């Protein structure tokens, strides 16, 4: 898979640089950067993941649980547990959470993403 450009996020939402989605909360807690690499395209038990939200969740599982980290990955203080990662996936699966181009970049490539985390 080829590496693609930087994708920026807002409020646990990922958006392409051309279509940034407004944050749904006022207080930003922080952010992290992650490379959604080929290893994030597969679940822990080896089956292929089929959507971008699953892949972002798997990236955080690879970071926190399995210590399989890409060189571009940064730590976060919000998605340490399976339950927290499930919440992240649910948020990202909401309509409008990610643009179509962002989803395609994640599913079909290895983009570098930034996730901004907001309270609420």
Annotated model-derived regions:
Residues 9-10, 28, 48, 71:
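Short, functionally important structural connectors and interaction interfaces within domains
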Residues 18-53:
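N-terminal leader/targeting segments
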Residues 1-25:
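Classic N-terminal secretory signal peptides
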Residues 27-31, 44, 83-85, 108-112:
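Extracytoplasmic
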Residues 105-120:
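Short, structured protein-protein interaction patches enriched in aromatics and acidic/basic residues
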Residues 33-37, 91, 114-118:
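Soluble periplasmic/extracytoplasmic beta-strand elements of cell-envelope proteins
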Residues 5, 40, 83:
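Solvent-exposed, flexible loop/coil residues
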Residues 46-103:
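Mature extracytoplasmic domains of secretory-pathway proteins
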């Amino acid at each position: 898979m080829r590496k693609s450009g930087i994708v920026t996020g807002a409020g646990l939402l990922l958006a392409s640089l051309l279509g940034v989605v407004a944050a749904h909360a006022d207080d930003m807690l922080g952010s992290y950067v992650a490379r959604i690499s080929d290893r994030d395209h597969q679940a822990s038990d080896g089956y292929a993941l089929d959507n971008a939200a699953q892949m972002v969740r798997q990236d955080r599982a690879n970071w926190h649980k399995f210590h399989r980290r890409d060189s571009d990955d940064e730590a976060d203080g919000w998605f340490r547990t399976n339950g927290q990662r499930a919440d992240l996936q649910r948020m990202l699966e909401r309509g409008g959470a990610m643009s179509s181009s962002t989803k395609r970049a994640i599913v079909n490539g290895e983009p570098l993403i930034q996730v901004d985390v907001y309270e609420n």
